[in-house]
Amino acid sequence: MKKPRLQQRGERRIAAALRIALAAALLAVQVLFVVLTTRYLKDHFALIYGALEGIALITALYIYNKPGDLSYRVAWIIPILFVPVVGLILYLLWGGDTQRKRLQRQTAPKLPPEEPESLRNRSALNADRLQRALPGWSRVSQYLSSRGFYLYQNTKAVYLPEGALLLEDILGRIKAAERFIFMEYFILAEGKLWDRMSAALCERARSGVEVKIIFDDFGNIKRFSAESLQTLRDAGVEVIVFNPVHEYVNRLYFNYRDHRKITVIDGETAYTGGVNIADEYANLIDRFGYWKDSGIRLEGEGVWGLTAAFLNMWSFLGGELHEERDYYRPHTSPATDGFCQPFLDGPQNNPDNPAEDTFLQLIGSARRFLYITTPYFIPDENIMRALCIAGDGGVDVRLMLPGTPDHWYADAVADSYIGELLEHHVKVYRYTPGFLHAKSIMVDRETAFVGSVNFDYRSFELHYE
């Protein structure tokens, strides 16, 4: 007999707490192993520990020679060599390619979504227009097009420089929704903001508007209760929890999460950026000082890029669509001069990752200036080299990082790169009012990126962005 949803959710929370505690307990196992072998097997301690270190060394060499980001591989190698009992157990549980392959089979939608020939033809025409208008940027667009991410025109883009502005804008559009509301988020956190958002979503659902939500389970273990989930479902809101925290320890995935932040309303308006649905993003509570974030609102043809992303994920996760796919397409096309090209990334793209490759091309294409904001800066060798080359080449490169970090260890790693950047004429700033969570790139006042991608390995390789 299937358990009630509330009971399932509660059991996952308890199991997750126990499994997180396991990581700390493993350190005690390492200490206990050393103490016991020293005391009771002291005549054989050197042999036993030497054999263990030999296994650890072989494992470390295996990891080192695997493809992928060096910093990520080193992050596994260090604990395996220095605390081999803990390191080997953790790697067996959560390292390697097992979880990636399993998720590719179970939860990975095809990226990008398949589209009709007519859309591909319009994208090609838009590419010709871009080549004539801004020839210097056609290469970046052509790369994304080659990966199946289409170029749109007739799209109005509004930059929203504060989380509170974006969230209030979303809330207002939700209240006016007539056909459907789609939301896909890493975090939905209970609080003042969620009380208003939930009330608006439930009211629209009861009025016959199609409301669908995807949220990541791991991102909400402590922040979104079973009662809040049931309130949505009772009102007619359809909810899918992405990659639920599994009852088995080896399926507690810290990575391979849905890190996207997408809202689509009636197919005419879409939002994305760094802003999750939580009070700190609107500065309704104080966490790490002033919380600086940003996002973008799209209206017109480009909205379809985000709508299709949501629909594809929804369908792959087993959700049903009540209408034909074309029902969800935009019907208005405001005349604009600019171009818009939404793109996605996820672990199934490896080793070909559109996000990092696009960032590298944006950096390499800068002629006058390059401004970057990111909360987490843990670049690989390719990103570091590209930034240093741009700085040495006379480009005004500016990197903005948080003044008050939310994770001290991530900030410590970011600090380790700053010296080299400064040597290559890259200017590095700290957002002194508090925590900077905005993810953006602006190049030569001609091209910009706004989205959910951080400058770190997890965004480039492990998460859905």
Q: Model-derived features: where do they sit?
A:
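Short, glycine-rich nucleotide/cofactor-binding loops
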Residues: 187-192, 373-380
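N-terminal localization/anchoring segments of enzymes in phospholipid and broader phosphate metabolism
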Residues: 1-357, 361, 365, 405, ...
